[in-house]
Amino acid sequence: MATPHIRAYRGKRIHMIGIGGSSMSGLAQMLLAQGYRLTGSDNLETYATRGLRDMGVPVTIGHCAENVHGAELVIYTVAILPDNPERVEAERLGLPTLERATLLGQLMEGSPVAIGVCGTHGKTSTTSMLAQALVVAGADPTVHIGGSLDFIGGSTRVGAGRVFLTEACEFNASFLHLRPTVAVVTNIDEDHLDFYHDIDDIQDAFRRFLKLLPKEGHAVGNGDDPRVTALLQELDCHTVTFGMGVCCDWRPVNLTYDARGCASFDASRHGKTLGHVTLRVGGFFHVYNALAAVACAWTQNADIEKVCEALSQFEGAHRRFERTGEIDGVQLYHDYGHNPAEMRNVLSVAKLQPHNRLWAVMQPHTYSRVKRLFQDYLTCTRDADITLVTDIYAAREKDPGDIKAIQLVEGMRANGLTAVHTPTFDDTEDYLRKHWQPGDLVLTMGCGNINQLNDQMNEHERAKEAGPM
């Protein structure tokens, strides 16, 4: 069966399986803005599913075959396995289906400037920074972010300009469905090892993505990452580098950090300062993200002073070291970081915030990732005073039976960390409430549903304050 094209289904009913996912919910909003009729389903009720329902999209919680009845096109993500009852029923009925990444590629078609931001870490923050910068600079871009940015009112923006900006996710090599004219590569590291054989296989996927660029296109890459620079040297298109190294095209000059880890620097190209950035988000990694945004905006002839002004106003994307509330004098934060490098990075920022004790609440994500990066998990929360570990979030995987969260906890203790296994959200909340003290900071981390623990604790606190009905 030929791959269906989304443009043939305007005015027809489209059903989206897993509509509450960070990318899928954004694509749903984009399709809705363009006049498509949508329904959707997800296995959990979340702020994303509630938000879509408020926009008029019928969303069913729970997957069942009947959900696809009456649909003329079914869209799914790679996280929705072939044995999902809705996918099974769509196949039985002979309904055309479209994978999320293919849909994104189709929506980008025809854009004179198609920017894909890829990398193992920092995609969402870099895309969000670049989106805000391009809007302020007057480019009026269409945007798709795998997260939510208040500045654009959510995860998508439909603009009237020449630019289509999106995250380009390397999981399952889905970014190969895109056709970028500009690519930004933040870094290349080990991840998604349930799909890739090893780091060389990962690098080769990025190679194939960059090879999609036309000769007149631009590749913007981290000049401090040897795997990224090696790929840039293979390209025939224009290349631009950013980083701390003296050989990078864009560098931060007069770089300083405030007490909370927020950087201030001059954005310098080939030794010439073109703007000044004072970030409101902490962490050395955000210097790289901001430089990537500046360098990419420069390829589009954007006013760099306006770009830097926009970056200085950037407040961060949701689920990226996001403060979610305060209970009993304890500050609650959440971050999407789900592999050891990301957890280590965000904890380096958390420890700079005023606090008594720092709690790290880790939801390990997928059995394959935990197995392949096991040793790195054992020390990545060393900056925390106490680490709580929930059960592993399976996501798209089935439990192999040979890896458990308690093994992580035992390994952490062997490495001198204070670690506790709290299997469920109820277990975790109960432990926190019994042991936290005013002035503590609690950071939950993971890309599964661990953010719902923050929601749960806040809801319970509001109910307690309201008293008995």
Residue ranges with predicted function:
Residues 14-16, 74, 115, 141, ...:
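Conserved hydrophobic helix-helix packing surfaces used for dimerization/oligomerization
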Residues 3-15, 23, 27-34, 111, ...:
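Nucleotide phosphate-binding/pyrophosphate-handling subdomain across enzymes
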Residues 36-43, 219-223, 359-363, 384-394:
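Short internal beta-strands
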Residues 41-42, 60-63, 98-105, 144-147, ...:
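Beta-strand->loop->alpha-helix junctions that form or flank phosphate-binding loops
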Residues 5-7, 30-33, 53, 67, ...:
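Phosphate-binding loop of NTP-binding sites
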Residues 16, 40, 143, 183, ...:
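Structural beta-sheet core signal
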Residues 378-438:
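C-terminal helical cap/extension that packs against the catalytic core
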Residues 1-103, 226, 248, 282, ...:
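N-terminal leader/targeting and accessory segments in enzymes
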